[in-house]
Amino acid sequence: MVAIAIFMIVVAAIYSTWTLILRASQTTQHTAAEAQRQRIALRTLEDSLTCIQSFQASMKYYGFVVQNGDSSVLSFTARLPGIFPRNRKFVNPDLGRDFNLRRLTFTVETGPDAEKDLVLRQNPVLMDMDADEQQTPLVLAHDVNKFTVECWDPQKMDWVNGWETTNLIPAIVRINLVLGGNPGAGYAAPERAVTRVIAIPSITLPSVLQIGR
């Protein structure tokens, strides 16, 4: 009996150790995956913002929209490179598609597991968004605790949470992206907060230059 008791204690200790190792491995894998997603999300935001285009005479199509809060929104129009995500859907010579000028809409939405996701939808600048983009946007990051976009206001000499100058685009934006763990999955990774300051190389083309004199 004593031998059996000792054996059970050893088995329990081995199982406890194995469980701890498994949980640590899950947390490490989850953290690494989310860190990679965070890098991809920030790279996508940076690439698109540096390709932004804006025309003062057509602000209906080229407006710059920022909305911070629980359901943050960032929307603008950009001429995108060939390596941009989902580009082959919009640029395909065989199908007669050449829509590299597209409106991008980044939003924070509730995902299928009740977590907050950062998603991206795209549509050609003169066309409505199709059903596929509406229903299955590109998910850039899961477990988003915070996504804010601040714009540098040269008049206030400070960062502002919104952008009310609708006929211009900001020269500099600051993006804050905070991703957290997923306790619902049985483990919790630490929060990962990243702030990125991005200078926008474009300016809004004045109406007089667009329509001529």
Language-model region placement:
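Conserved acidic
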Residues: 6, 37, 136
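Extracytoplasmic beta-strand-rich oligomerization domains located immediately C-terminal to a leader/signal peptide
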Residues: 13, 17-132
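An exposed acidic His-Trp-rich patch
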Residues: 126-149
